[in-house]
């Protein structure tokens, strides 16, 4: 049986300092446990082949396709504010696939063994975190948020030592690219301007080709990246997503969400919510995500200074001007999104106060973030704390008055709300239930059911209360771990 697949690799046209040719480590008995047939179809892949034993050999990296050059990418980054040399320490890029509509995607194996960038790690991954990334990334796709995708998860037949012995696994990740802010930091810190320019030109041609011929293309490039990240972070905030580890190596230039280690979705609304066990100071808490994205982008701007203008002072001024746009862009995207969540079509002077008042009540009465907007969409109040609140009723009256002043009908307002207020999200306790069944009992039914529901989060005709129910009080204090 033949895979009938051709992988390109344009990344190796960059100077050799940006990567190392690296074969994945062979594993004893690769077994496919999760296959994303929908994504496979989008990529034009033969599901029959890849679900076969031979297909598992290819997906695990045990068998390398002809005429391909697997690589590990070099990059640096600020991790919790501290700069360090990094790189793909447990991942190998098999190559790039070009779809029928001329879209180019990286095919990367995560958990594929040691590389020159492993820094003492074993280069391996375990089953739970890889399945978790599969669930969350597909959940983000369903929510309409730009994200890397998960094509497959395989067990390797290995036992990996972490706090305990765990089953080894490999995730097959699909991304528009894996070029990170940290890739530009690496070029600026360790290479010459010539190599930095080569990286910038390659990235522009791959992701922002419409600006390549423009004068001041590097300024235009920085502007587009800032705008895309402002939009992305607004989308995160609007659904209560907390990434957990917004280091510069986890911000990709394409504008996709990447690296789902310690991420989680907020249940009870509170701006200071943080889930990651390693984020002890709350650096990447929910309310800090816009600020930290701006900080990361400032590091990109610093790296691009040699390209922005021959005069360093002028280049720094340009960089600062573009970074200063982030806050305005973010707030524009966020307020636009919040108005939609409230069924409001057009901007009004009272909207900011209306939105802030609702969020304040949600904090005061410990309301569930997702279900508050779900209830508003359904014209109901299911949360006990809000149900008996005179303050909340007063807010509802103000909101209804605001909606009635629109030219658009109430029916159109409800349709708008249904299109942006999910009935379900990847609730942390439901994700953990699915992972426990899969990892401990080899039972993937709960995971399959969860992923199926998450693919249609805005389906108000077929709501599933089981997946919409917040955790009980005993599930509070949820903590996430990066799984590295």
From Swiss-Prot:
Question: Per the UniProt record, which EC number(s) apply here?
Answer: 2.7.7.-, 2.7.7.108
Pfam families found in the cross-reference section: SelO
Name the positions where ATP binds. 87, 89-90, 110, 122-123, 173, 180, 259
> What residues make up the catalytic site?
249
Record's keyword annotation contains Glycosyltransferase: no
Q: Which reaction does it catalyse?
A: L-seryl-[protein] + ATP = 3-O-(5'-adenylyl)-L-seryl-[protein] + diphosphate; L-threonyl-[protein] + ATP = 3-O-(5'-adenylyl)-L-threonyl-[protein] + diphosphate; L-tyrosyl-[protein] + ATP = O-(5'-adenylyl)-L-tyrosyl-[protein] + diphosphate; L-histidyl-[protein] + UTP = N(tele)-(5'-uridylyl)-L-histidyl-[protein] + diphosphate
Cystine bridges = none
Listed GO MF terms? AMPylase activity; ATP binding; magnesium ion binding
Q: Which HAMAP family match?
A: YdiU_SelO
Stated role: Nucleotidyltransferase involved in the post-translational modification of proteins. It can catalyze the addition of adenosine monophosphate (AMP) or uridine monophosphate (UMP) to a protein, resulting in modifications known as AMPylation and UMPylation.
PANTHER family xref list: PROTEIN ADENYLYLTRANSFERASE SELO, MITOCHONDRIAL
Similarity section: Belongs to the SELO family.
Q: What is this protein called?
A: Protein nucleotidyltransferase YdiU
Look up and give the organism this protein is from: Lachnoclostridium phytofermentans (strain ATCC 700394 / DSM 18823 / ISDg) (Clostridium phytofermentans)
Taxonomy of origin reads:
Bacteria, Bacillati, Bacillota, Clostridia, Lachnospirales
Corresponding gene?
ydiU
């Amino acid at each position: 049986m033949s895979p009938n697949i051709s992988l390109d690799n344009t990344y190796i046209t960059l100077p050799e300092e940006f990567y190392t040719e690296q074969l994945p480590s062979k594993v004893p008995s690769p077994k496919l446990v999760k296959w994303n047939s929908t994504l496979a179809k989008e990529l034009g892949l033969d599901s029959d082949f890849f679900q076969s034993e031979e297909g598992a050999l290819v997906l695990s990296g045990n068998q390398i396709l002809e005429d391909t050059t697997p690589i590990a990418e070099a990059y640096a980054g600020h991790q919790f504010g501290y700069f360090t040399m990094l790189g793909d320490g447990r991942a190998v890029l098999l190559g790039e696939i070009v779809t029928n509509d001329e879209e180019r995607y990286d095919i990367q194996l995560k958990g594929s063994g040691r590389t020159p960038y492993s820094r003492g790690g074993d280069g391996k991954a375990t089953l739970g975190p890889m399945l978790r990334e599969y669930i969350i990334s597909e959940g983000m796709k369903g929510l309409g948020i730009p994200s890397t995708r998960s094509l497959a998860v395989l067990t390797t037949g290995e036992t990996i030592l972490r706090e305990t012995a765990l089953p080894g696994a490999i995730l097959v990740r699909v991304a528009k690219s894996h070029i990170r802010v940290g890739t530009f930091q690496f070029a600026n810190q360790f290479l010459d301007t010539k190599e930095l320019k080569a990286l910038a030109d390659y990235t522009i041609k791959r992701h922002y080709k419409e600006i390549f011929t423009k004068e001041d293309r590097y300024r235009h490039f920085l502007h587009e990246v800032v705008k895309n990240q402002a939009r992305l972070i607004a989308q995160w905030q609007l659904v209560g997503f907390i990434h957990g580890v917004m280091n510069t190596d986890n911000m990709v230039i394409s504008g996709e969400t990447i690296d789902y280690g310690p991420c989680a979705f907020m249940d009870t609304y509170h701006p200071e919510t943080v889930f990651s066990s390693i984020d002890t100071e709350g650096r990447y808490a929910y309310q800090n995500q816009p600020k930290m994205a701006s900080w990361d982008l400032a590091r990109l701007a610093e790296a691009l200074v040699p390209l922005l203008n021959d005069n360093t002072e002028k280049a720094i001024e340009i960089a600062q001007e573009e970074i200063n746009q982030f806050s305005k862009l973010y707030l524009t995207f966020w307020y636009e999104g919040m108005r939609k969540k409230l069924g409001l079509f057009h901007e009004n002077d009272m909207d900011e106060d209306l939105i802030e008042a609702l969020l304040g009540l949600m904090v005061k009465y410990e309301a569930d973030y997702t279900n508050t907007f779900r209830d508003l969409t359904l014209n109901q109040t299911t949360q006990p704390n809000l149900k008996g609140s005179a303050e909340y009723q007063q807010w509802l009256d103000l909101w209804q008055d605001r909606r009635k002043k629109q030219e658009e009908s109430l029916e159109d307002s409800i349709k708008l709300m249904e299109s942006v207020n999910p009935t379900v999200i990847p609730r942390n306790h439901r994700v953990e239930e699915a992972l426990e069944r899969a990892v401990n009992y080899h039972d993937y039914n709960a995971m399959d059911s969860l992923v199926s529901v998450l693919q249609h989060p805005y389906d108000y005709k077929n709501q599933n209360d089981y997946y919409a129910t917040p955790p009980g009080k005993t599930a509070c204090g949820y903590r996430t771990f990066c799984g590295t």
